A protein has these predicted regions:
Chain B
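Detector for C-terminal structural segments
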Residues: 23, 39-42, 202, 206, ...
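Alpha-helical secondary-structure segments
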Residues: 42, 117-124, 152-158, 194-195, ...
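N-terminal lobe/hinge region of extracytoplasmic solute-binding protein
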Residues: 44-95, 126, 191-192
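A structural "hinge/loop" feature
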Residues: 47-64, 87-88, 114, 136-137, ...
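Gly/Pro-rich hinge or "lid" segments in bacterial periplasmic/extracellular proteins
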Residues: 82, 163, 168-222, 226-228, ...
Length: 317, 509
């Protein structure tokens, strides 16, 4: 078991290093010189050279990669070209927006999808089933950013109940910050909830046909108790798997929603860094996303190991 | 745009009842608040600045937050584009134009307590013109040969050659005065002498400024206590933030097609002013067939500027015949030099040896005005048998690399933001690859005199040369689309220099 774990962790580190090399190579191939962008249309060769030197862009690629990697390993992610502040702090600031947003969206989608999916499965073709089908088809078909625009029009522009966008920061109180995350979380949650409703519905349907469910019915338990007490908890495993996958997707994929609501999240940081060729920030953010996916996969692997003894035996060979 | 129907009457009634109770409860507080005029401002901008030091990076957004609010210069440029004294209260220019003697104000302090004097001014200018300088307008200072500071109040600039635009340039955001102790950190924590102090920067969202209680200029009455610059890049989100009341003002609204959506809003007012943003379609003047003046003239005559403005910017914009705006001193309306005439254009093209036209590629940045203009131009060029392919080119990164630095392009389109930058056609190297000794001579002559009337005459001649020679197709000047609260006073309606000067902004009771 320990050997296996060590091997897995070693593999994880190798993967991260490989990813970092790939990310660095891709950045090096991107057209556009950050120094030239900073100086704009009045750049002269002389000022350009001075700025490139200041930014460290005049160093050979291999040295720049080495410096970046060595820095990243010691927790120093470098300084943003455009903002002039350490990238680690920037990412932390953005996570303080993106993580609560993703968590809120997940929470909302679970609260809607699990009861709706289960109720739909309980009575196929019934009212909730039709509702669930309609909801999930709409949720998948309608783009989240468009929903976001509609929400802004209704709740911010017309009714004035909610801010139209922006983020006051957690320093100005929890409520104002939370308030500015509600509409984007709804917009973000809708497509997720749609997928999750479908997954829940089919998982519950499958579980309903399992032996223990039939046994429970045969024992004379009421339909509701069988469904909510036995079937739904057992059907949650595939639902949780999808949720895990969605979380990484939400953290990385909220760019459009963050743009509609002008939220200073991680997705928008990556987008801005790309257009400004703030290469250091972009490298770090991409590496962070990659690391997130790799670590989540690692945790999933570990949980399989914990569940299935056969894998443990196989791994120790 | 989608409209929502009103809530049902019962909902409205319930809401009204609720708010009646609430407002009665808050009446006392409300009354005491109403007596004091509002002293905060939420101002929107489309682009977030990259750093907050205008002396080390070019993006105009930096100056739009900091210039005149945090940082001040020896001189300033006012609402009408005039040079006015600021940290220098007066100056004298020697008869040969080679020595500028400034008398500086005394008792001026930076926000962190550093004193401003001639040594500080010398430090700032040496930093801007030195070998390590990354000042985006370093060329402004290139003729300063040496700087003398006989006493704390006196600054003397000795020039290697007369520089008639020096005073104007010293009024720019890139020429503001910085403190020796604080300049290294100005990018993230700017320290200036202005009426507002930097307070906080939530990257990706907003910058906060607060009133400087120790501001040196007692003749102005700064009313705002706190200003928040919020950065919103999406036009729909900009409009929503204005209508929802999240923002008090958007001095440079980015979407002309949404301007009329503010009509009928009782709280907001719209103002259409001038900017210095010249939208021009630059051509590679050394590449065939653009090396032939007749071809360039034919292309200019194939374009109906009015239609382009209509298509690209909802009709809001001023047609130009040269690289000059109606704001600028000595402006001449030259749109009649090569007016829209497709038949003449076709004949000229045949004369140049292209009776059947030709085809080329335009590299267009993604900013809304560029692809929209290009599409209208494409149709107009087709009328004279010229095929124009549109190649989207990411701005700034790819555009700077391909067009600006690489000069690997046929035609491009971009809005030039620098005020009074007609001299770019004399710069070598510059992306147009335009070379005209007569024009260069004029640009030199302008620097040899500090006499405004003489300069204006020379600028007039320079405009005429460009209008005739068309190194770039001169299309239009962008309007300054201001949207703000009706009770807000003192924001600039025109923009002789990119800025959001808040010194005289206040709320009407």
């Amino acid at each position: 078991m320990i050997v296996l774990l060590t091997r897995r962790i070693f593999g994880l580190i190798l993967t991260l290093i490989a990813v970092s090399l790939l990310v660095f190579a891709v950045m090096a191939l991107l057209p556009g010189d950050p120094a030239a962008i900073t100086l704009g249309t009045s750049a002269t060769p002389e000022t350009l050279a001075a700025l490139r030197h200041e930014m460290g862009l005049d160093q050979p690629l291999i040295i720049r990669y080495g410096q970046w990697l060595a820095g990243a390993l010691t927790g120093d992610l470098g300084k943003s070209f455009t903002y002039g502040v350490p990238v680690a702090g920037l990412i932390a600031e953005r996570l303080a927006v993106t993580l609560p947003l993703a968590a809120l969206a997940i929470l909302l989608s679970v609260l809607v999808a699990v009861p709706l999916g289960a109720a739909a499965a309980a009575r196929r073709g019934g009212f909730f089933d039709i509702l669930a089908t309609l909801f999930s088809q709409m949720g998948i078909a309608v783009p989240g950013f468009w929903v976001g625009l509609l929400l802004v029009l209704l709740f911010a522009t017309s009714l004035g109940w909610m801010p139209a966008g922006g983020f006051p920061g957690w320093g100005n109180g929890v409520w104002p910050a939370l308030k500015s995350l509600v509409l984007p979380a709804v917009a973000l949650a809708l497509p997720q909830a749609a997928v999750l409703t479908r997954v829940t519905r089919s998982a519950v349907l499958d579980t309903l046909h399992e032996d223990f469910a039939r046994t429970a019915v045969a024992k004379g338990l009421s339909r509701g108790r069988v469904l909510w007490g036995h079937v739904v908890p057992n059907a949650l495993v595939p639902v949780l798997t999808i949720l895990g996958l969605q979380f990484t997707f939400l953290v990385a994929g909220a760019v459009l929603i963050e743009n509609v609501f002008t939220l200073p999240g991680l997705g928008r940081l990556a987008y801005q860094a790309l257009s400004q060729r703030d290469i250091i920030v972009l490298q770090d953010v991409v590496l962070f996303f990659a690391g997130l996916v790799i670590v989540v996969n690692f945790l999933v692997d570990l949980s399989y190991l914990a569940i299935d003894p056969r894998l443990r035996a196989g791994g120790a060979r | 745009m989608t409209k929502f129907s009103c809530p049902s009457p019962s909902v409205v009634a319930r809401k009204l009842a609720f708010s009646a109770v609430l407002s009665t409860g808050l009446l006392m507080i409300g009354l005491t608040q109403a007596e004091a005029a509002k002293t905060t401002l939420n101002l929107g901008m489309s682009v977030e600045p990259t750093g907050l030091d205008p002396t080390i990076a070019a993006p105009v957004a930096i100056g739009q937050v900091t210039w005149q609010n945090i940082f001040e210069g020896l001189v300033a440029i006012d609402q009408n584009g005039k040079i006015v004294p600021q940290l220098a209260k007066s100056w004298e220019i020697s008869p040969d134009g080679l020595a500028y003697t400034f008398k500086l104000r005394t008792g001026v302090k930076f926000h962190d307590g550093q004193a401003f004097d001639s040594a500080t001014a010398k430090f700032t200018l040496d930093r801007a013109r030195g070998g390590q300088s990354v000042n985006p307008q370093k060329r402004f200072f290139s003729t300063i040969a040496s700087i003398d500071t006989p006493d704390a109040e006196t600054l003397i600039l000795h020039l290697s050659s007369p520089t008639g635009s020096l005073l104007y340039w010293l009024g720019w955001p890139s020429s503001v005065m910085v403190g020796p102790k604080s300049s290294a950190n100005d990018k993230t924590a700017p320290v200036g002498t202005g009426p507002f102090k930097f307070s906080a920067w939530a990257k990706g969202d907003h910058v906060d400024l607060v009133k400087n209680p120790d501001y040196w200029n007692k003749s102005v009455d700064v009313k705002l206590e706190k200003v928040t610059f919020r950065f919103i890049s999406d036009p729909q989100a900009e409009a929503a933030a204005l209508k929802a009341g999240d923002l008090d003002a958007f001095p440079e609204f980015a979407a002309p097609e949404l301007m009329n959506s503010f009509e009928g809003d009782p709280r907001l007012t719209t103002k259409i002013g001038n900017t210095e943003l010249k939208v021009v379609a630059g051509m590679n003047n050394t590449r065939k067939p653009f090396d032939d003046k007749r071809v360039r003239q034919a292309l200019m005559m194939a374009l109906d500027r009015k239609t382009i403005i209509e298509g690209a910017w909802s009709g809001l914009g001023t047609a130009i015949g040269s690289h000059y705006t109606p704001n600028d001193p000595g402006y001449k309306d030259l749109t009649g030099t090569l007016p829209y005439d497709a038949a003449k254009a076709k004949a000229l093209l045949a004369e140049a040896g292209y009776p059947n036209g030709f085809s080329f590629t335009i590299k267009t940045p993604q900013m809304a005005y560029a692809p929209r203009s290009a599409q209208v131009m494409q149709a107009m060029f087709a009328d004279i048998g010229v095929t124009m392919n549109i190649e989207p080119t990411e701005f700034p990164a790819k555009w700077v690399q391909d067009v600006f630095s690489g000069r690997n392009y046929d035609m491009t389109i971009v809005a030039h933001a620098e005020p009074l930058d007609i001299d770019i056609y004399s710069r070598d190297p510059y992306y147009f690859n335009y070379k005209n000794p007569d024009f260069n001579e004029l640009m030199k002559k302008i620097q040899l005199t500090a006499d405004a009337a003489e300069q204006n005459k020379l600028y007039g001649e320079a405009q005429s040369i460009l209008a005739e020679d068309v190194p770039a197709l001169f299309l239009f000047v962008m309007p300054k689309l201001g949207v703000w609260d009706k009770k807000l006073k003192g924001l600039w309606e025109n923009e002789p220099i990119p800025s959001n000067v808040l010194t005289n902004v206040s709320w009407e009771d």
